[in-house]
């Protein structure tokens, strides 16, 4: 997959607004006469407006040199009217889009003034006008990526924090696609990835993915593209495992019919395994994917006739890695380790028919040691997840072990389940009820209790 894919974007609200701004009729003479801007500022902006071709504009910039930068800065800072600030920023954004090497004119003046080139624009990010804010994002992005000077330190933190705030405003913000587009460009550079991840950036992207779920697949693709770019950094790939990223994109994998969305989800999942240098974290990533039914979804995707070589390769990679994990997770040793640590969660064994068929009797080994542990968890644990899983396992033991019902009742398991039927948590009540039903009937399959 190539970085250039982020150029194929929908026409955003921002772009439509920019078209209107470019048609604005300016009256720079008014501000010159009132001495809000200098004559040199007036001379430059009028001359630049009259330039009709790219070559003409390059000539104007080479003639005015640093005066061009001073003029731009004065037009943004000395004139308070939003429409003129909008217009000036649009001129600058268009100028850089036409030739990104023009970022150097801001860098050269910044060096002379002993300040950062980004400082000319960062103050505009607090403005209320969202067009001004997002045009500033666009300008800063071009400078931060294509310029020779990279944004760092407090300036980088402020820039990334502003972008994060922009995408967490959600669907009500018509400019969200513009902020995401900037991220698609910024996250090519590793320090920018780290900075964004360190301010809970994944959570904001997940929020944006949810808030724009009814806005079409293109914005969905762009947001996941940002996630994919972040996972090229090992630290970022590790941080992703602490949140709900895998759960979020696995849901999309199971519902999206767009090949490009499926492709970027698979590429992101692959990176979460491949980019993690720590073997333990690789296994954790694969475990989360198994728990979120990625392997099942990959099996379903195999029925589709994909032509994309990268997509097919990513599917094969994930299937191979996840099957390794399933083999380990469905081993009784892994289950026993989970049980002894008291950290029950929905790992594959708990819902695997083959696992219980082959291993249910082992809960009776060593004077029913493991079965007693499960019942103790039902009696003493305050963790709803542990209670749900323990109740499930008691039910599966009864279901697959001929004398399971008798052993559970003798150890007080039935009473423990009955007490759980009155707890506040609805999930705990649900799994306790299922287990209690299995204690009371003989034909388990008639219950239709596939969970």
Curated annotation (Swiss-Prot):
One annotated Gene Ontology cellular component of this protein: vacuolar proton-transporting V-type ATPase, V1 domain
Keyword annotations from UniProtKB, A to Z: Hydrogen ion transport, Ion transport, Transport
InterPro entries linked to this entry: ARM-like, ARM-type_fold, ATPase_V1-cplx_hsu, ATPase_V1-cplx_hsu_C, ATPase_V1-cplx_hsu_C_sf
Cited Pfam families: V-ATPase_H_C, V-ATPase_H_N
GO MF annotations, alphabetized: proton-transporting ATPase activity, rotational mechanism
The keyword Electron transport is assigned to this record: no
Claim: Transport is one of the keywords in the record: yes
Oligomeric form and interacting partners: V-ATPase is a heteromultimeric enzyme made up of two complexes: the ATP-hydrolytic V1 complex and the proton translocation V0 complex. The V1 complex consists of three catalytic AB heterodimers that form a heterohexamer, three peripheral stalks each consisting of EG heterodimers, one central rotor including subunits D and F, and the regulatory subunits C and H. The proton translocation complex V0 consists of the proton transport subunit a, a ring of proteolipid subunits c9c'', rotary subunit d, subunits e and f, and the accessory subunits vah-19/Ac45 and vah-20/PRR.
Record-stated family: Belongs to the V-ATPase H subunit family.
Function statement: Subunit of the V1 complex of vacuolar(H+)-ATPase (V-ATPase), a multisubunit enzyme composed of a peripheral complex (V1) that hydrolyzes ATP and a membrane integral complex (V0) that translocates protons. V-ATPase is responsible for acidifying and maintaining the pH of intracellular compartments and in some cell types, is targeted to the plasma membrane, where it is responsible for acidifying the extracellular environment. Subunit H is essential for V-ATPase activity, but not for the assembly of the complex.
Protein name per UniProt: Probable V-type proton ATPase subunit H 1
Natural source organism: Caenorhabditis briggsae
Origin organism lineage: Eukaryota, Metazoa, Ecdysozoa, Nematoda, Chromadorea
Encoding gene per record: vha-18
